[in-house]
Amino acid sequence: MGVEIETISPGDGRTFPKKGQICVVHYTGMLQNGKKFDSSRDRNKPFKFRIGKQEVIKGFEEGTAQMSLGQRAKLTCTPDVAYGATGHPGVIPPNATLIFDVELLSLE
């Protein structure tokens, strides 16, 4: 349970997000069956969120916080750190495990 991180391509191995910093990422979110539900890449606009402010689901934040600058990783988030039993009506079914392809582009 929680978030599992699998590196796709390594980052610098030194620069990690700190609480209060803004992470600038590109991501694609998918259900376990591979169905894409969201992608900053498709919009061609990086997504920003602040670490420690609960602006994203817990698994996304916990996973990104363990990535180093420039890293691209697959984050597998179990329902307890995603949308849980409620899901996100019309988009995420209840008790769904979510998979994100995340690239940490920069920190602000």
Swiss-Prot record:
Residues 20-108 form the PPIase FKBP-type domain. It comes from the Eukaryota. It catalyses: [protein]-peptidylproline (omega=180) = [protein]-peptidylproline (omega=0). GO terms for biological process: calcium-mediated signaling; insulin secretion; insulin secretion involved in cellular response to glucose stimulus; negative regulation of calcium-mediated signaling; negative regulation of heart rate; negative regulation of insulin secretion involved in cellular response to glucose stimulus; negative regulation of release of sequestered calcium ion into cytosol; neuronal action potential propagation. GO terms for molecular function: calcium channel inhibitor activity; FK506 binding; peptidyl-prolyl cis-trans isomerase activity; signaling receptor binding; transmembrane transporter binding. Gene3D superfamilies: 3.10.50.40. Inhibited by both FK506 and rapamycin. Its EC number is 5.2.1.8. SUPFAM superfamilies: FKBP-like. Keywords: Cytoplasm, Isomerase, Rotamase, Sarcoplasmic reticulum. GO terms for cellular component: calcium channel complex; sarcoplasmic reticulum; sarcoplasmic reticulum membrane; Z disc. It is an enzyme of class 5 (isomerase). It is found in: Cytoplasm; Sarcoplasmic reticulum. It holds the Pfam family FKBP_C. Belongs to the FKBP-type PPIase family. FKBP1 subfamily. Has the potential to contribute to the immunosuppressive and toxic effects of FK506 and rapamycin. PPIases accelerate the folding of proteins. It catalyzes the cis-trans isomerization of proline imidic peptide bonds in oligopeptides. Identified in a complex composed of RYR2, FKBP1B, PKA catalytic subunit, PRKAR2A, AKAP6, and the protein phosphatases PP2A and PP1. Interacts directly with RYR2. This is Peptidyl-prolyl cis-trans isomerase FKBP1B. It comes from Mus musculus (Mouse). The gene is Fkbp1b.
